[in-house]
Amino acid sequence: MNLSDFGQRFNGYSGITHLMDDLAEGLAQPGVIMLGGGNPASIPEVNAVFSEVLDKLSASGELVSTLSNYDAPQGKSSFLETLAHYFREQYGWDIGPSNIALTHGSQSAFFILFNSFAGRAGGSARRVLIPLVPEYIGYCDVGIDPDLLCSQQARIVHLDDGFFKYRVDFENLQVDDSVGLICVSRPTNPSGNVLSDSECEQLDRIATAADVPLLIDSAYGTPFPNIIFEPVTPFWNENCIVCMSLSKLGLPGARTGIVIANEDVIRYFSNMTAITSLAPAGLGAEIVNRLILDQQLQPLCDDLIRPFYQARADLAVSLLREAIDDPRLHVHKPQGSMFLWLWFEGLGITTTELYQRLKRSGLLVVPGKYFFPGQEAADQSHAEACLRMNYVQSEAELGKGAEILAKELSNCW
């Protein structure tokens, strides 16, 4: 193919492509323990609620209407109205439908937002600053400019019982005119880290002083799907862009993301949607609109989704500790999302090599090096000592995965 510079940029083999290929390969091989992907758990009680809503939408004719009509580029207007009212009532935000847009999943939103606020303009180049790594693998390759991202290594805090936690290193965080956007996730994929309210407020002050937006990726966060195990307050203001998703609610196939921002950003974003994809999908919006109107959404998250993931996180930690009784295993405190982040001190090999050994033994995880965007020129020793594992699988699979990991670690330690 004779590709343009744009085409060449996305013709490589990225970390997110590697992850999705391994997921597909693992699904095709019976017996492989799949602790590498990011697919949400299939929770029967949650699926039953979705089925009930779809039955109601089908009976009323709304399902066929949704599937047979385009929505506006900004998204389904009835859902935007419902969401705005929901956020006003729940959190007192000064927000209306003109502050919200829908998109084909959060990933497409990141592509638009990263390349709109950062990149080349007027002879200079601005970058997306990630103030704490490790961070989401999906940020790494969305830039049209390959040098779009820069990042700050986290401050590591050791906790009791073999846990540790990442915190923003504000003392060394520098924001100058080369930064066009600051981006964080809350909770963080891969580590399960949750930024405190005070950390969010301090990042907001820094972003406001630098006159750049603060983007908060809340794909796992509050108020929905609320896969977050710490008491936190949702954060938004006119200088903040919040990205949410219906995927981790249990609807990844609906490909629906939510962008909350000031009206100028939403107008621009909607224009980009019209140009690139005409309009966002409407099915996920219709389902969640009905859940909110019937006052089912928050109980679904608080009483079913969050307890499920918290119990699985606790179980996964317990199984790991039982299989690997070694103080050189450090586990990031699981505060949210659906992953455990493991740090192996003095391993002797990189977790990239460990990943290959585990793969041959029938266990799929993700090596840590993919989660450090903007750190390509930095010391990779910590990145290569960590890996991510998904804990949504059954107790039997988690236990078998822990045993395989323990066996391979014994050969390294």
Locate each region found by the language model.
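Conserved core of the PLP fold type I
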Residues: S65-A210, L215-W236, I241
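Structural signature of PLP-dependent enzymes
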Residues: S270-T276, D294-S318, L347
